[in-house]
């Protein structure tokens, strides 16, 4: 069984961050923690989700950096990975009725107030906009092109999608369905087939692919247990 537990409890301790970047990380971490205290967010999309995504991202980042060194590829930007992970669900349209401009205002303001430039804030915004699963389904080529420009996006994408599968993903799926009140238990099981089990094939990094394989297998095993216990599904009239 893979051992992928993130060792960076404090993201500001990630190697190679400058003093200024460490300060920025701490400010954005605090901003995000406060932001997700709003009761509109349920347990499927809360600060604990953000922390898990951040942990996944740093685990993948470390492995990707090692691989890039071996292949003499350009270095990645740890700050972009960290901020992208922390901010990826700010003004999520599933919870907040805002325009894209409204999201940009919130994200960019937070990054600028944390000590970064307007141009870098726009860079982080572009990364965050590319994380969305629905956006990739609508225009996969755009996301592919964006990852070519911002390779850190692939890491944050994988990190977020990993939290949608495995044991955590199962819990989050049922939690979201219950919180929104529009999805039955059987509908949630169907969601595993319709979306969650497809995420493994959408991973961008080698580390993400390996982690997704194990977590997807856990969903498949759970679905076997569900069918054993629930019996045949009877369609309602």
Identify the residue ranges that each predicted region occupies:
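Conserved strand-to-helix beginnings and helix N-cap segments that scaffold or border functional pockets
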Residues: 96-100, 167-168
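His-Asp-centered metal-binding catalytic motifs of divalent-metal-dependent phosphohydrolases/nucleases
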Residues: 74-96, 103, 125-134
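Short alpha-helical hairpin
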Residues: 17-35
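An active-site-proximal "capping" alpha-helix that borders the catalytic cofactor pocket
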Residues: 53, 101-113
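Divalent metal-dependent phosphate-bond-processing catalytic cores, especially two-metal-ion Mg2+/Mn2+ enzymes
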Residues: 2-20, 39-47, 51-74, 87, ...
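Membrane-interface starts of transmembrane alpha-helices
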Residues: 117-124
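Amphipathic alpha-helical segments within well-ordered protein domains
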Residues: 58, 87, 91, 107-112
């Amino acid at each position: 069984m893979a051992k992928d537990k993130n060792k960076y409890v404090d993201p500001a301790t990630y190697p190679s961050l400058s003093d200024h970047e460490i300060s920025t990380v701490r400010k954005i971490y605090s901003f995000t923690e406060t932001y997700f205290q709003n009761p509109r967010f349920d347990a499927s999309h809360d600060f604990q989700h953000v922390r898990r995504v951040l942990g996944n991202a740093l685990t993948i980042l470390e492995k990707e950096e090692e691989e890039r060194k071996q292949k003499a590829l350009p270095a990645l930007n740890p700050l972009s990975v960290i901020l992208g992970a922390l901010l990826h669900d700010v003004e999520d349209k599933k919870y907040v009725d805002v325009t894209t401009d409204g999201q940009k205002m919130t994200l960019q303001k937070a990054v600028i107030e944390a000590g970064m430039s307007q141009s870098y804030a726009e860079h982080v915004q572009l990364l965050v906009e590319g994380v969305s699963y629905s956006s990739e389904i609508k225009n996969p080529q755009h996301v592919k092109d964006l990852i070519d420009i911002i390779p850190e996006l692939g890491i944050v994408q994988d990190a977020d999608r990993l939290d949608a599968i495995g044991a955590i993903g199962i819990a989050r799926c049922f939690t979201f369905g219950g919180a929104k009140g529009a999805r039955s238990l059987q509908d949630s099981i169907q969601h595993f087939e319709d979306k969650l089990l497809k995420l493994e094939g959408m991973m961008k990094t080698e580390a993400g692919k390996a982690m997704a394989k194990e977590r997807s297998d856990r969903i498949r095993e759970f679905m076997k247990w569900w069918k054993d216990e629930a019996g045949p599904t009877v369609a309602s009239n």
